[in-house]
Amino acid sequence: MLNPSRRGTVYGTLLNHADALAALGAAACAPPYKAPPVAPVLYIKPRNTWIGAGEAIVVPEGVAELEIGATLGLVIGRAACRVREANALAFVAGYVIVCDVSMPHASYYRPALRFKARDTFCPIGPFMPRDAVGATDVLESLRIAVSIDGEVVHRASTSGLIRPPARLIADVSGFMTLSPGDVLSVGVAAGAPRARAGQRVSITIDGLGRLDNPLVAEGPPA
């Protein structure tokens, strides 16, 4: 994984997969928003959520299952401020697998911190340098698979992104600077599978390898 001491902020992107937006149906146009988002919708996975391959995802007491969101993470290599889409990938140092874990919830636009920012809720996988993955067209067709206890339960592809990686960086850097070490995850597809304590989840992305993590039940309070 990317050395946590060198990592900046980890950002997640909501509703950037076409099928995730479609799954909302009429709710995407309901008050108070009344229309689908026209700019990237971001949230933060704080430092307490970060773990590496092989480390345990903790299932909070009273929670039966967790949603396992598999996504591609873009690791920023140099400060990106108002960059053009055509140049955006030049600001990327490499890529990681991100397991964006959540407690199941219905609030898509403004999920409470307790649903997405619990300890261990962001395993981050092996770092792959940009040049080892390939050009823009490769990034836009990466296959993503989630397995639970060795069985593939969910498949997705970056081809379903509303904003592919280069455009996402350009749009986000248009309103805030992305700093070296930041990780911008591109978003989770619809139908994220659920897993429970005692199971093991594995995420693979073409060219990036594998990220494996067991799930364990939360222990008693200290």
Q: What do these predicted ranges mean?
A:
Residues 1-2, 31-32, 58-66, 80-87, ...:
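A generic local secondary-structure boundary/capping motif
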Residues 1-5, 20, 102-222:
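Catalytic-pocket segment enriched in acidic/His residues
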Residues 1-71, 123:
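Extended, compositionally biased flexible segments
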Residues 5, 15, 38, 52, ...:
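Conserved active-site and cofactor/substrate-binding residues in soluble primary-metabolism enzymes
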Residues 20-21, 53, 83-85, 105-107:
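Short helix/loop capping segments that flank catalytic or ligand/cofactor-binding pockets
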Residues 24-32, 85-96:
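Short Gly/aromatic-enriched secondary-structure transition segments
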Residues 45-47, 70-72, 76-78, 96-101, ...:
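Short, structured patches in soluble enzyme cores that scaffold and shape functional sites
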Residues 69-73, 92-96, 123, 141-143, ...:
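Broad gene-expression machinery/nucleic-acid interaction feature
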